[in-house]
């Protein structure tokens, strides 16, 4: 899967993969923001993240307390009309429903600038976002290997080794792949080779 579209509560999130980057468009109430994220900027760490407005939950509980207090007050005063307490109980229930409806369950993917990419876990269903994330990581790994897991005897040893370490740290290559490339690098490029001046 190369595209993912998610819509919830007037918010649209569109994700599209190219050969070397992820295009992300976020729009809400007609305001749109589109950015492109190079694969180099996607660290790939995926964690579960829930977003909810606890103030709304607190307000709902507060209104329930008011409804209960009014109900008890009417009983203590011998009143039979509970319409006021019922009204506030209905209001509290509506607020609680709003709270549950607006809770968001995301996959949070870390980016190199300490920002995160958020992808709904269950929109349009559970399987499609999972497949898209797998495609994203697979395409990222493929691109990074093609461009950074190469050995060139004319390039600096240390910078090439740093590339291999970076690829291993973000999970683009395995430890075994790293060790194989490391041995190949040492056999191809002299670690003590200097770029400036004269060697002794």
Question: Locations of the language-model features?
Answer:
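Short, non-transmembrane cytosolic segments of multipass membrane proteins
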Residues: 1-34
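Phosphoinositide-dependent membrane-docking surfaces
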Residues: 22-24, 34-50
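Surface loops and adjacent helix of pleckstrin homology
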Residues: 27, 47-50, 98, 121
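Short, surface-exposed beta-strand-loop junctions and turns on beta-sheet-rich folds
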Residues: 29-32, 115-116, 126
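Alpha-helical transmembrane spans
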Residues: 52-103
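Transmembrane-cytosolic junction motif
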Residues: 96-117
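Charged, low-complexity cytosol-facing tails and large interhelical loops of integral membrane proteins
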Residues: 121-200
């Amino acid at each position: 899967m190369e595209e993912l579209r998610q819509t919830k509560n007037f918010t649209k999130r569109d994700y599209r993969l190219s050969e070397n980057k992820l295009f992300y468009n976020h729009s809400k109430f007609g305001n749109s923001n589109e950015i492109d994220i190079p694969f180099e900027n996607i660290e790939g760490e995926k964690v579960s993240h829930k977003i909810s407005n606890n103030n709304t939950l607190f307000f709902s509980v507060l209104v329930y307390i008011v409804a209960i207090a009014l109900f008890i007050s009417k009983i203590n005063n011998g009143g039979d009309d509970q319409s006021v307490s019922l009204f506030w109980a209905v209001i509290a229930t509506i607020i609680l429903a709003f709270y549950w409806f607006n809770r968001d369950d995301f996959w949070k993917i870390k980016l190199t600038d300490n920002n995160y990419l958020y992808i709904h876990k269950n929109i349009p269903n559970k399987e499609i976002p999972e497949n898209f994330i797998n495609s994203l990581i697979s395409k990222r790994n493929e691109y990074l290997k093609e461009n950074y897991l190469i050995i060139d005897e004319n390039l600096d040893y240390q910078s090439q080794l740093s590339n291999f370490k970076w690829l291993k740290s973000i999970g683009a290559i395995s430890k075994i792949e790293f060790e194989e490339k490391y041995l190949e690098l040492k056999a191809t490029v002299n670690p003590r080779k200097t770029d400036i001046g004269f060697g002794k």
